[in-house]
Design a protein with these regions (language model features):
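Predominantly a Rossmann-like dinucleotide-binding segment in NAD(P)-dependent oxidoreductases
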Residues: 138-218, 340
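NAD(P)-dinucleotide binding in Rossmann-like oxidoreductases
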Residues: 215-222, 231-302, 319
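A general structural signal for well-ordered alpha-helical segments in protein cores
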Residues: 28, 32, 44, 54, ...
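C-terminal helix-rich "cap/oligomerization" subdomain common to oxidoreductases
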Residues: 1-15, 81-83, 119, 305-346
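Hydrophobic residues in well-ordered beta-strands that form the structural core
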Residues: 27, 67, 84, 106-107, ...
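N-terminal Rossmann-like dinucleotide-binding module
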Residues: 1-61
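Rossmann-fold dehydrogenase core element
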Residues: 119-137, 157-161
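Beta-loop-alpha module in the N-terminal Rossmann-like domain of NAD(P)-dependent dehydrogenases
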Residues: 61-123
Length: 346
């Protein structure tokens, strides 16, 4: 009797071994622990210019190797991919160095100090053939997949307006976000979130933008900002701040309804998320529907999706071209705040 053929199953993907550049708070408190919870993203090394910090972080997190220089980690043959959470002005130089060593790179947002600098990183990616992406972790969260599906289904009719806000309070003079030469300021740090979300949801680039910024008189970084983006299909408004109460929200308005995203950007890994859908017909502004999403670690999901792209499955969640588009908008907003005119992203 002939043997029955066994069903074909895809072999498991080979894990991507990660090295971490720097012992930044986001790396030590969020990204490394998240990656360590996935078999796809083992963290094998961490580097700091202060070897003591690298060893302390490695010991605390159970990372096998600690290096006292970024070069040593990048040149480690057992590292497949680099996570780069260094200060903003070091994103592109060290990402290029890693790419030239044959390492894939997941670089923290904002990717660069300008769109022109982002183009340099695109050139390095194209020369080396490695995968490089920007770390907008919220794009991996299931709530945003649901929002995009609702928009595709026409649940709110035609999307016409995206309104976003992200702020926190931080006046620490030692914080890298308060150093202008290092790419500090609220627009670069948190204003980039509602901007990238609006571009992602509209699926197009803004034709022109206008913005207003208020600067801290001591640190000389923008501490409060707002802007308007005009797209071919609609508009987006945003506000951001680094010296106002912590808050985040995104609202989408269409011709037939709206969607309210309660915690759009940085929900805690143990915190469930909700979106609200209003068809505009409920009396007194009552929300017609609430959709809940179980708690997930979006940093883990981000690492897994990027690693899958490295292994040829799927694509990098936020491409360099997408990141460059976001920087072009931010560049134009800085110009607009000075010129007090509408500016065209370029």
């Amino acid at each position: 009797m002939p043997k029955r053929a066994q069903p074909f199953t895809e072999p498991p993907l080979v894990p991507v071994r990660w090295g971490i550049l720097g012992a930044a708070h986001i790396a030590v408190s969020k990204v490394i622990p998240a990656m360590q919870r996935s078999a796809m993203t083992p963290v094998v090394a961490i580097a700091s210019r202060d070897i003591g910090k690298a060893r302390a972080a490695a010991r605390e997190l159970g990372v096998a190797r600690a290096y006292g220089s970024y070069e040593e980690l990048i040149d480690d043959p057992d590292v497949d991919a680099i996570y780069n959470p260094l200060p903003n002005h070091l994103h592109v130089p060290w990402s290029i160095r890693a790419a030239e060593a044959g390492k894939h790179v997941l670089c923290e947002k904002p990717l660069s100090l300008s769109a022109a600098e982002a183009r340099q990183l695109i050139g390095a990616r194209d020369r080396t053939g490695v995968q490089i992406g920007e770390a907008f972790m919220m794009r991996a969260h299931p709530q945003w997949a649901a929002v995009r599906e609702l928009l595709a289904e026409g649940r709110v009719g035609e999307l016409k307006l995206v309104a976003g806000h992200f702020s926190y309070f931080r006046r620490d003079p030692t914080d890298v976000r308060n150093v202008p030469e290092w790419g500090g300021g609220a627009l670069m740090d948190v204003g980039c979130y509602p901007i990238t979300i609006a571009r992602w949801l509209f699926g197009e680039e803004p034709l022109e933008v206008t913005g207003m910024l208020e600067y801290d008189p001591v640190y000389n970084v923008d501490r409060l900002g707002s802007g308007l983006l005009r797209f071919p299909s609609g508009q987006a408004t945003f506000s951001s701040g680094s010296q106002v109460v912590h808050y985040q929200r995104v609202q989408l308005f269409g011709t037939e309804g709206r969607i309210d995203v309660e915690i759009p950007f940085s929900p805690a890994a143990d915190h469930a998320c909700r979106i609200f859908i209003d068809d505009g017909l409920a009396l007194g502004g009552a929300l017609a529907e609430e959709v809940q999403f179980p708690a997930v670690d979006q940093y883990r999901l981000q690492g897994e999706r990027f690693s899958e792209a490295v292994r040829g499955v799927g694509h990098v969640p936020t491409t360099l071209e997408d990141a460059m588009g976001n920087m072009a908008v931010i560049d134009a907003l800085f110009r607009s705040a000075k010129s007090r005119r509408w500016e065209v992203p370029e």
